[in-house]
Swiss-Prot record:
The keyword Signal applies. Pfam families: BRICHOS (PF04089). Residues 26-181 form a propeptide. This is Arenicin-1. It comes from the Eukaryota.
Length: 202
């Protein structure tokens, strides 16, 4: 791997890893195994945009917001996560899961827009570790559907029209229950060494 490829990517999405009766499926290992390539930075008004292996990370320091978009595949649109530090909300559209989600509160492990932008700019062209330092696990609150779609960020609101929207809550840490299910869909967002992940099992 070249020095360019070893540059840590602040945010990247790894979506749709399916585990079928596989108790050895290790999301952290899957994330570590991902290769991160060159990134291209450009500016669009207040938004600073970084293209990473076909994925787009947008940072707005003035609004303290971050958007992470993943390219789609197999006829399915890519997922979009909007981290709004000002409002303390995370909106997440995951087309492969067929639902949208809200997270109330932005974990302190996630860098705000200023920190993220500084990290991107200072790490540009330099080598840095790309290992996952920690993970934030979320599960769907089945009894907490979101009825007001206006809570969703405008960047995902249209994609969430007609879909079920739920609040996500931090996982209790019980990882055994999903292994009893037949199908699991994992969605990941990696933000400067912190893995934000959601697991939905049937």
């Amino acid at each position: 791997m070249t020095s360019t490829q070893s540059v840590a990517v602040c945010a990247t999405l790894i979506l749709a890893i399916f585990c079928v009766n596989d108790i050895h499926c290790d999301p952290i290992a899957e994330a570590r195994a991902a290769a991160f390539g060159e990134r291209e930075a450009r500016s669009d008004g207040e938004w600073k945009q970084f293209d990473v292996n076909g994925e787009k990370i947008e940072v707005n320091e003035q609004e303290n917001r971050e958007i992470i978009r993943q390219a789609g595949g197999d006829g399915v649109e890519g997922s979009v996560m909007v981290i709004d530090h000002a409002k303390g909300l995370i909106s997440w559209s995951i087309p492969r899961a067929g639902e949208c989600y809200l997270i109330g509160g932005v974990d302190k492990q996630l860098p705000d827009a200023q920190e993220l932008l500084h990290y991107f700019q200072s790490a540009q062209g330099s080598a840095d570790g790309e290992g996952v330092e920690s993970a934030l696990d979320y599960v769907k609150a089945e009894d907490r559907p979101v009825t007001d779609l206006n809570l969703l960020a405008p960047e995902v609101r249209e994609a969430c029209q007609g879909k079920s929207v739920y609040w996500l809550e931090k996982s209790s840490g019980d990882n055994n229950e999903p292994e009893k299910r037949r199908w699991c869909v994992y969605a990941y967002v990696r933000v400067r060494g912190v893995l934000v992940r959601y697991r939905r099992c049937w």
